[in-house]
Swiss-Prot record:
The lineage of its organism: Bacteria, Bacillati, Bacillota, Bacilli, Lactobacillales. GO terms for molecular function: DNA binding; metal ion binding. GO terms for biological process: defense response to virus. Ca(2+) 1 binds at residues 118, 122-123, 128. Its cofactor is Ca(2+). Ca(2+) 3 binds at residues 122-123, 128, 132. Keywords: Antiviral defense, Calcium, DNA-binding, Metal-binding. This is CRISPR-associated protein Csn2. Ca(2+) 4 binds at residues 132, 138, 142, 150. Homotetramer. InterPro entries: CRISPR-assoc_prot_Csn2-typ (IPR010146), Csn2_sf (IPR038600). The gene is csn2. Belongs to the CRISPR-associated Csn2 protein family.
Length: 219
């Protein structure tokens, strides 16, 4: 994956864990705004090696780490879709589930007939069953570091998301924690961009200084 915007002379390649530090506050804020407004048409360009642009739905952006809900409706919808696809590979199991949900719908239908009001039901589809069962991601994070790892794990399993961007995440992590996150990202072979306003210590990174000169160095 590659990123380009007006302050860069050439695109930056995002491969596994990539760090980009922008020292000028206004430029940093402008890029954050472009990321949030990304539609594939503004000055921010995200694309792969074949020059194919990243779709807005393929971008996963996190600023408020502790406040980020890994069990958001959008995330659960993707997970339910993956589970349904998994069931499609097991026709016997899916058939059994459909028979059981059909029986449940039939029993409830009998009760609706006996109710004083005219009631109807639409039946149960598989994804609605997942929701009714309360299927969600188990969350055990107590620290910002654990939450970063948790979010990265979620990104790993969301097949429709191709790029995760953390904004100012390293501000809250120790050098050792950053190293563990980098190792986890590498192990899972996902692309993650860490956009920072301060230099990340002891880490190779792209640094855009106050004079808009881009360098790649270890701070």
């Amino acid at each position: 994956m590659r990123v380009n915007f007006s302050l860069l002379e050439e695109p930056i390649e995002i491969e596994k864990a990539t760090f980009l530090t922008i020292k000028d506050v206004q430029s940093f804020a402008h890029l954050v705004k472009l990321i949030y407004q990304y539609d594939g048409e503004n000055e921010l360009k995200l694309f792969d090696a074949q020059q194919k642009g990243l779709k807005p739905t393929e971008l996963f952006v996190v600023t408020d780490i502790l406040g980020y809900d890994v069990n958001s409706a959008a995330t659960l919808k993707l997970i339910y879709g993956d589970l349904e696809a998994q069931l499609n590979d097991k026709p016997e199991v899916k058939s059994m589930i459909e028979k059981l949900t059909g029986t449940i719908s039939q029993l409830i239908g009998y009760e609706l007939l006996e109710h004083e009001m005219d009631l109807e039901e639409d039946g149960i589809i598989v994804q609605e069953l997942f929701k009714a069962l309360g299927i969600k991601i188990e969350t055990t994070s107590d620290t910002i570091f654990e939450k970063v790892m948790e979010i990265t794990q979620v990104h790993r399993y969301l097949s429709k998301k191709k790029l995760l961007i953390f904004i100012n995440a390293c501000t809250y992590l120790t050098e050792d924690e950053v190293q563990q996150v980098v190792e986890y990202i590498s192990l899972n072979n996902v692309d993650v961009l860490f956009l920072e306003q301060r230099v990340v210590q002891n880490r190779f990174q792209y640094i855009l200084d106050e004079n808009f000169y881009l360098s790649y160095e270890k701070a």
